[in-house]
Amino acid sequence: MEKLKSFRHLNNNIDLILNEENSTEILGAQAHIWNQIFNFINSMSLKCAIQLGIPDIINNHGKPMTISQLTLALPINRKKSPCVYRLMRILIHSGFFALQKAEVGEEGGGEEEGYVITDASKLLLKDNPMSVTPFLLAMLDPVMTKPWDFLSNWFQNGDPTPFDTANGMAFWDYGSHEPKLARFFNDAMASDARLVTSVVIEKCKGVFEGVESLVDVGGGTGTVASSIAAAFPHIQCTVFDLPHVVADLQGGNNLNFVGGDMFVDVPATEVVLLKWILHDWNDEESVKILKKCKEAISKSNKKGGKVIIIDMKVENEKDEDDESYETQLFFDMLMMALVTGRERNEKEWAKLFKDAGFSNYKITPILGLRSLIEVYP
C-alpha cells in the first residue's frame, strides 16, 4: 500500500493503477497513441509501392496476382521476398489493394488468393492522365517532410513558416533555386489540374456560359487553361504566372501565356480563375490578390465578370470523425508548415470576399474535398 500511495503522489494524484474498471480505457488510450505515432507508415509504405511500381505491375497482370507472381515481378533483392507479403498486407488494410481468388497451376486446377487494384490505386497508375502519383512523390519528398521536424522550434522563433526554419528560406524561394523541387511541384499541380478540370468541364459547363475571356492566375504550365480553351473555343484563355514559369511555354489559337506578379497587376479579363492559389497565402495577402482580380475584371468593361476559386471549404467541426474532415485539417497544417496560408471555412471565405470589396458569392461543393466558388464584384 505504501508503494501505491507513493506512486499516486509522484504522479500528481493521477490514478494510473490498472484495475478491472479502467484497464480497458488505459490500454485503449495507449493503442490510440501508438496509432498516431506510426501513422506515417501508411504514407511511406504507399510511397514504397509507387517506387517499386506495384500498382502498374498488378494492373498489367490482367487478373488477380498471387504473392509469388508479384514477388518474382518486382525489381527487388530476392532476400527481401518474404517481406513483400507484409508490405502488401498494410496496403490492403489502407484500401489500395484487395484480394480475390486466383487460379494457379498449369491447368488452373488450384485456387489461391491474388492481389487486384482498387479505385484508390487506379489513381496511382502511370498511364492514368489523372494520376496523383506526382503529387504523392512531391508531398513525401524529404524536402517537404523535413519542416515537420522543426514544428516545435518554429512555434518558439520568429520565422514565418517551419519550412523557413528547416531550410533557411521561404518555400517559393527554395523552389526557384532547386529544379528538382520545382519539377515535382509543377508535375503534382498538373496531375491534380487534369483531374479537377475534367470534373469542372463535365459538371459545371454553365460556369463558363457567355464568358469571352479568362485569366488563370498562378496557372503554372497551363494544364487547366489549355483544357478550358479546348472545351470552350469561344473563350480567350490566358495563363498568368511568374515570368520564369511561363518563359518557354507556347500558346495556341485561344491560349496564351503572360508573365507577371499577381500582387502587382492582373491582366484585364472578364473572369479570373484561382485554382488552389488562395490557400497558399494568409488573409492579408489573399485580400490583396482578390483586389487585383477585381481590378482586372473592372478593366475588361464586361458585365457579368467574376472570380472562380477552386479551393477547400472546411466542413463543420461536428464531422471531426469523418476522413474528409481530417484530410482537410491535414491540408491546413500543411499550409502552415510550408507557406503562410490556410484552409478556410465558409465564414472565413465570406470575410475575405467582403474585405476585398466583392458583393456576393456562390459555393458549389462538387470537387470532393474542394469546392468551386464563384465570387461577384
Curated annotation (Swiss-Prot):
EC number(s) stated in the UniProt entry for this protein: 2.1.1.-
Gene3D superfamilies, A to Z: Vaccinia Virus protein VP39, Winged helix-like DNA-binding domain superfamily/Winged helix DNA-binding domain
Keywords: Methyltransferase, S-adenosyl-L-methionine, Transferase
Record bears the keyword S-adenosyl-L-methionine: yes
Binding of S-adenosyl-L-methionine, residues: D241
Enzyme class: transferase
Keyword Repeat: no
Active site: H279 (proton acceptor)
UniProt-recorded name of the protein: Probable O-methyltransferase 3
Species of origin: Humulus lupulus (European hop)
Gene name linked to the record: OMT3
